[in-house]
Amino acid sequence: MQRLGPLHPGTLVDADGFATRERAPHAAPHVEICMITTPDGATALDGRSGPLGGPPDQEMLRAWRRRCDIVLVGAGTARAENYGPPSREGLRIAVVTRTCNLDYSSPLFASGRGIVVTTTDAPDVPVESVRAGFGEVDLAAIIGSLGARVVHVEGGPALNASLLAADLVDAINLTFSPRLGGAHTGDAIATAFDGSRRFVLVDAAREGDFVFARYERSR
């Protein structure tokens, strides 16, 4: 990949180099949203973000996963993208759900690498669960109890919005896809939140027609 700036424009970097970040000491875990969008604003085709990506995007995703302690994902995204166990040994995927209506025989949960994140009043589940909040998942409490330094978030829109509304997001790792969504668009972030919060561009790189950008919270 070729860096575009604002630091070291024109230099070459691979996905692992781009994903390697110095993070300042932080009392709470670092929460980083990873998402993809197109020139016409689509974030999904027929409910899935996978078709918008390609080999460069997949390698970048794997690089971000290699540098996190846990993956956090909404139940709808996990179902739509048919999540399986992560390829990295020891990495676990925490699925956020209020209803616990999940396929616990799926490869993700059968592998023992899937965790359910839900409310204290949700039904019992046959796998490991982390619970906080009554009626609504208390994401701040959940993230604090995961024992993770870096939480890598893979959507969907409702989870992204909830994390932003709770002021829990430290960085956004955004892929710009060269594909167009047309009528099959989706929102990267669903519901309104305080738009006064600002993120600053700290790095960007290009691989083919894909552009990767990292924004960090301005505090």
Question: Where in this protein do the model-derived segments appear?
Answer:
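Enzymes that bind and transform nitrogen-containing heteroaromatic metabolites
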Residues: M1-R219
